[in-house]
Amino acid sequence: MFKNIIIVVAVTLCALFTNEHVVYSANLEHGEQIFSANCAACHAGGNNVIMPEKTLKAEALEANNIKNISAIANQVKNGKNAMPSFSRLSDSDIEDVANYVLSKADKGW
């Protein structure tokens, strides 16, 4: 019994401290469609035509403390600075586009 507890704790700690982003069971293809229709005008290829230093590339997301699905979804839903709110999108659409963005950032766009 003690051995099982140790294994569970070890696996949990590994999962907590890994640097890999977890892309949840989102529909990345749907996220790409939402991105193309709503985000690509300013963020084509992970860039930013309004504020060039605030791209969707992994390094920029990390530097701006936007390093997980929740943070990206919050930015999409509420907007910030020059980025408008996309709260008209459904929560499912926002989650899919956030997963798509993080997936692309992890792959270098």
Swiss-Prot record:
The keyword Signal applies. It is found in: Plastid, Chloroplast thylakoid lumen. InterPro entries: Cyt_c-like_dom (IPR009056), Cyt_c-like_dom_sf (IPR036909), Cyt_C6 (IPR023655), Cyt_C_IC (IPR008168). GO terms for biological process: photosynthesis. SUPFAM superfamilies: Cytochrome c. Gene3D superfamilies: Cytochrome c-like domain (1.10.760.10). One of its GO terms (cellular component) is chloroplast thylakoid lumen. Binds 1 heme c group covalently per subunit. Residues 1-25 form the signal peptide. Keywords: Chloroplast, Electron transport, Heme, Iron, Metal-binding, Photosynthesis, Plastid, Signal, Thylakoid, Transport. The keyword Hydrolase does not apply. Heme c binds at C39, C42, H43, M83. It comes from the Eukaryota. GO terms for molecular function: electron transfer activity; heme binding; iron ion binding. Monomer. Belongs to the cytochrome c family. PetJ subfamily. Functions as an electron carrier between membrane-bound cytochrome b6-f and photosystem I in oxygenic photosynthesis. This is Cytochrome c6. The lineage of its organism: Eukaryota, Rhodophyta, Bangiophyceae, Cyanidiales, Cyanidiaceae.
